[in-house]
Amino acid sequence: MARPCRVLIVDDSALVRQTLADLLSADPGIEVVGTASDPFVAAKRMEAVVPDVILLDIEMPRMDGLTFLRKIMTQHPLPVVICSSVTEQGAEATFKAMEYGAVEVITKPRLGTKRFLEESSIRICDAVKAAARARLHRLGHRTRDVAPKLTADAMLPGPTNFTRVQTTEKVVVVGASTGGTEALQVFLEAMPPDAPPIAIVQHMPEHFTGAFSRRLDGICRIRVREAEDGDIMARGQALIAPGSSHMLLKRNGSRYTVEVKDGPLVRRHRPSVDVLFRSAARYAGANAVAAILTGMGDDGAAGMKELHDMGAHTIAQDEATCIVFGMPHEAIRLGGVDRVLPLDAIAPAVLKACAGS
């Protein structure tokens, strides 16, 4: 049996440290080896034991988290998960941390409903496990899930020949998780101003997808924004599912639209790639082009197989360029992938598929 993932928690709030320690310690696949109130205390802790993952706050006294992150990545690289506030300032700092090498982001736990606390526990534990795997760039021992995995059946029926829509309009659907923020930037920066409409699910906490969309919008030639319920899918535009909401592709006459709605965690996620992919299989069928990028777990694999079976062109990111080769690996294993490509080749391949060549 593989040893538990060792985690060091660094946060200036004693309450947050204790809450995170309690949530993580409840998972048999995780061991909290220490907590620290600031980076200086953390450095002392690391002299005694080197963790597999550091859970790091950004705003701290004496030394902020970004400075500590830079030091970690230049002196002793380790997987780092950012534990951030949900403020606008916190979101911007989080994306700066991702540029410096952090591999995951979670929101600070807070008191709430039973459902909120249960879902927070799942997301935090999954983020830590994903970060631990990111260092290895390969799939390792898979621990038993602590909560049931619902499938896309929880949100909509599977595709059938009856539901396939006869149309020639192409639409692109993309799913990503760990490492996806940088992968999506590479993918979207390669898109021309008249690119086909794109719908994206990136596993990310609530309140961060808006800032992420604005960041991409400022550097890409296409328009990128957080999706709202009823949005029309348009050429030259990418819609990113809001954190904590599912996004489904729909068809309204001659146009594709998106439905943004609440619902249970599907494949332990909301938004779920499987939900987006299944809806695309139902309403776009062979007119969809799908890409599954870096990420831990299996969200999107079943949905990609459904897209493939309906005649869609499907692409998976290769292991060499993935931060975590989990979601693409599972999609390949299920037989739902037409092509396996390095990250920088995916956008050109998507455009060729949309052009019918």
Swiss-Prot record:
UniProt-listed PROSITE patterns: CHEB, RESPONSE_REGULATORY
Residue positions of the active site: S177, H203, D299
Broad class of enzyme this protein falls into: hydrolase
GO biological process assignments: chemotaxis
Cellular compartment(s): Cytoplasm
First-listed, main subcellular location of the protein, grouped into a coarse class: cytoplasm
Similarity section: Belongs to the CheB family.
Function: Involved in chemotaxis. Part of a chemotaxis signal transduction system that modulates chemotaxis in response to various stimuli. Catalyzes the demethylation of specific methylglutamate residues introduced into the chemoreceptors (methyl-accepting chemotaxis proteins or MCP) by CheR. Also mediates the irreversible deamidation of specific glutamine residues to glutamic acid.
Protein name: Protein-glutamate methylesterase/protein-glutamine glutaminase 1
